Amino acid sequence: MQQHFHFDAIVIGSGPGGEGAAMGLVKQGARVAVIERYNNVGGGCTHWGTIPSKALRHAVSRIIEFNQNPLYSDNARTISSSFSDILNHADRVINQQTRMRQGFYDRNHCQMFSGDASFIDANTINVRYADGTNDTLRADNIVIATGSRPYRPANVDFTHERIYDSDTILQLSHEPQHVIIYGAGVIGCEYASIFRGLSVKVDLINTRDRLLAFLDQEMSDALSYHFWNNGVVIRHNEEFEQIEGTVDGVIVHLKSGKKVKADCLLYANGRTGNTSGLGLEKIGLEADSRGLLKVNSMYQTALSHVYAVGDVIGYPSLASAAYDQGRIAAQAMIKGEANTHLIEDIPTGIYTIPEISSVGKTEQDLTAMKVPYEVGRAQFKHLARAQIVGMDTGSLKILFHRETKQILGIHCFGERAAEIIHIGQAIMEQKGEGNTIEYFVNTTFNYPTMAEAYRVAALNGLNRLF
């Protein structure tokens, strides 16, 4: 029998954006319903995206570390693992994350509904369950936090057993010797690192002229060199004409006339917002061609009581930002305005092997803006801690204003880059004279640490001034 419920707010989706909104609302006394399509909370971030891919990367990087460390490699011992082996590690992490996040909802008395959500009208949502039954939920406010999914061109047969996207790759049931990755964005580059780390041949097909063009060019070049040095074949400025599935593999026909054959294909070229099926047309909302919704600074759509957060609104499409967007939307919903906002310089972490992380401006940005900047560099191979642990590939680069010494950008390539970046970010976020590269010279760091790279880079940069 269909039931009817009323809430202060309904949150559609339980990924980072939905969780941030739901927790922000219940902490302010709201009665909240959360609708999740799948049986487990966490969204794509937990089950198909961020968490499993980073768990896979960690397992592979530890294998590489063991095999390259002189303590072990001098004994002619090596270890190896298959993709299915390291998937077990990812599954354990996913289960831990799911239990923890379910606990958040339970402790905060969010009422959960496991089904597909669609609008009946601007304040009413239908929840359709797997058994075909329905419930009707009404609320004063609604948050759309449905995330995104891999883009699937109509002319690619994703039903073929050797053609995967970044969600279905976790269901890989065979052991490929050769993989084609179509799309050299963040996801494509991360999986190129994972497969190559497992000694799988990798062809990385890039539709652009260089890898991760939004990065500082030195970081992009460093990744390209590292891939080349480890045997990844990168094909720039290429697009597919046809993707042909065969009995035992895939052939990619490129518009340039080339052909590439491998055991399987990972298609990782773009994502689209999860808005189809929501019934947006019933409330007068329309997503763009990529399935994304437009919002204002308080994450309100064209309907002031309907909010949208996370990947479904596009940039920056980061789990960390989605959670903050959800909290800000919750505050705006309850108080009528948001006292906080996303920071201007959001750090990016790219979990290739080695990692890349950046915050602030690139050298290309500052040159185009005609800002008089200087560069301070530290090579990891010169740091005692890096030498001790055997991870001496990488560098830290600090960009700062020649006259004010204000830090303008920080770029790191190497193991633990995504952690190291936050030290510099904390100083960059200081107001006025608190943001200065001299902080790193005048502060005593633990020794030996990777954080010492900031002191080395600061001294290097300041020594360039005249």
Curated annotation (Swiss-Prot):
Write down the superkingdom of origin.
Bacteria
UniProtKB keywords:
Cytoplasm, FAD, Flavoprotein, NAD, NADP, Oxidoreductase
The record's top EC class is: oxidoreductase
Q: Could you tell me the EC number(s) of this protein?
A: 1.6.1.1
Q: Which GO terms describe its cellular component?
A: cytosol
Query: Which BP terms from GO are recorded?
Result: 2-oxoglutarate metabolic process; NADP metabolic process
Catalytic activity reads: NAD(+) + NADPH = NADH + NADP(+)
- Cofactor binding annotation: Binds 1 FAD per subunit.
What this protein needs as a cofactor is:
FAD
The record's annotation in InterPro entries points to: Class-I_Pyr_Nuc-Dis_Oxidored (IPR050151), FAD/NAD-bd_sf (IPR036188), FAD/NAD-binding_dom (IPR023753), FAD/NAD-linked_Rdtase_dimer_sf (IPR016156), Pyr_nuc-diS_OxRdtase (IPR001100), Pyr_nucl-diS_OxRdtase_dimer (IPR004099), STH_gammaproteobact (IPR022962)
Compartment list: Cytoplasm
Q: Tell me which residues bind FAD.
A: 36-45
What GO molecular function terms would the record report?
A: dihydrolipoyl dehydrogenase (NADH) activity; flavin adenine dinucleotide binding; NAD(P)+ transhydrogenase (Si-specific) activity
Which PANTHER family does the record match to this protein?
A: DISULFIDE OXIDOREDUCTASE, SOLUBLE PYRIDINE NUCLEOTIDE TRANSHYDROGENASE
- UniProt family annotation: Belongs to the class-I pyridine nucleotide-disulfide oxidoreductase family.
What exactly does this protein do? Conversion of NADPH, generated by peripheral catabolic pathways, to NADH, which can enter the respiratory chain for energy generation.
Q: What is the protein's name according to its record?
A: Soluble pyridine nucleotide transhydrogenase
